[in-house]
Amino acid sequence: MTDQEHSASEENADSVEKHKYMRKIRSFVKREGRMTNRQQTAIDTLWDTMGIDFEEKLIDFNALFGRQAPIVLEIGFGMGKSLIEMAKNAPEKNFIGIEVHGPGVGACLADAGEAGVTNLRVINHDAVEVLDKMIPDNSLAVFQLYFPDPWHKARHHKRRIVQPHFIENMRHKLAIGGVIHMATDWENYAEHMLAVLQASPDFKNTSESDYAPRPEWRPLTKFENRGNNLGHGVWDLLFERIS
């Protein structure tokens, strides 16, 4: 997400916060945009095989994929290019992607279908509700959160998805030995992520320093490449569930 998009998110949030009827804090602003014909066609033709409808029922991953394999779950996959590349490069794993942006879901399905990816399923819904209602405890091998909205302004920090209660929820969803992998290009958010993870006695940092080098399995995005060329930093965090 660009700085301009981040600013737009914050402006939208300022407006939303004025409404007293808002029942809960959300970590995202849902901007649907225009669905292209290609994206809509992908949803119409591929949803039955690659899409998962939201329901208050735990997913049976073995039945869903027709096999038993490590589950990698990613929240906020955007247009899905990195997620598809990871799924292609790790056919021995099963991937679940959660995204609230409809056109992004359509783009992901279209690209995954063209690439012949079969070990990927997507959910178009609020990730927090999906985690609470659909993801079994102790079921995930890896949880991925790449470049979430940093909510720059201090008064919006409460909207950041990475909070102590969120990490505690992820502790339940990850199996012992499972890994949380986060990445951000916003240093203040990286420091926030690090502080929240370090405060949990149930996780340990897999890196000898605070932040880890980008692992080879996380593809570079166009945005990240552009930032690297401009000298902008990117911070990866990998923490393992130990209890």
Swiss-Prot record:
NCBIfam families: tRNA (guanosine(46)-N7)-methyltransferase TrmB. Substrate binds at residues 153, 185, 221-224. Belongs to the class I-like SAM-binding methyltransferase superfamily. TrmB family. It catalyses: guanosine(46) in tRNA + S-adenosyl-L-methionine = N(7)-methylguanosine(46) in tRNA + S-adenosyl-L-homocysteine. Pathway: tRNA modification; N(7)-methylguanine-tRNA biosynthesis. The active site is at residue 149. It comes from the Bacteria. S-adenosyl-L-methionine binds at residues 74, 99, 126, 149. It holds the Pfam family Methyltransf_4. One of its GO terms (molecular function) is tRNA (guanine(46)-N7)-methyltransferase activity. The keyword Glycoprotein does not apply. Keywords: Methyltransferase, S-adenosyl-L-methionine, Transferase, tRNA processing. It is an enzyme of class 2 (transferase). Transmembrane segments: none annotated. GO terms for cellular component: tRNA methyltransferase complex. This is tRNA (guanine-N(7)-)-methyltransferase. Catalyzes the formation of N(7)-methylguanine at position 46 (m7G46) in tRNA. Its EC number is 2.1.1.33. The keyword Phosphoprotein does not apply. Gene3D superfamilies: Vaccinia Virus protein VP39. It comes from Psychromonas ingrahamii (strain DSM 17664 / CCUG 51855 / 37).
